[in-house]
């Protein structure tokens, strides 16, 4: 069974700052330099999007980034090749932080369930987040993922009931992922003050019904929001704002420089 880098990290008494990045965005060849920049700038975990033509929970920035990734040749096989290179230090410094893949069921089914789990594990992936995999239907997938040493992360939303929060906490291998707003990522449709009025009680409710760690994502754009979320949870995920920060890069090295510059503002 492959070594999993997430579990030891969960035992550390620290708040986690997690980066979400769409491979080969905004230009082909950007992935490995950007991963190096994020690791060097203090990302504790890197979440890589698996681009899909019909995402259900992604806002327009991530949807657009996925289309760019697809145009630049990203598919599951090429993404796993990039992870292998990152782990081997081919084209960048050796990437040692945990890597979680986030994507949807259909491409994984098309690839082949056990083939995907085996190839992901061998490439150096540590965890999976599959938004459209219902926890109550995930027993077999969880068992197979565990046999390949892969951590599985499930989502909690503001409308998730306490009993289901407990179920998700029990099923998530190492940590769960709380959506800070009940909307698609990065849309920011709710006023920040309105969100803040509800989010503290929501995360307190999650805390009361979980034993494992949980992190918060969706709409976190700056250090102030990171600090606020980390005061209420075990970590924060920043994705849309990172993609926006590097959107104007014309070369891989420029994308890496922009990623590093932005990420350092969050710490």
Curated annotation (Swiss-Prot):
Matches recorded under Pfam families: Trp_syntA
Residue ranges crossing the lipid bilayer per the database entry: none
Keyword Nucleus: no
Known catalytic reactions: (1S,2R)-1-C-(indol-3-yl)glycerol 3-phosphate + L-serine = D-glyceraldehyde 3-phosphate + L-tryptophan + H2O
Top-level EC class as recorded in UniProt: lyase
Pathway: Amino-acid biosynthesis; L-tryptophan biosynthesis; L-tryptophan from chorismate: step 5/5
PROSITE patterns, per database record: TRP_SYNTHASE_ALPHA (PS00167)
Active site location: 47 (proton acceptor), 58 (proton acceptor)
InterPro entries: Aldolase_TIM, RibuloseP-bd_barrel, Trp_synthase_alpha_AS, Trp_synthase_suA
GO terms for cellular component: cytosol
EC number: 4.2.1.20
HAMAP family associated with the record: Trp_synth_alpha
Family membership noted in the UniProt record: Belongs to the TrpA family.
Name the record gives this protein: Tryptophan synthase alpha chain
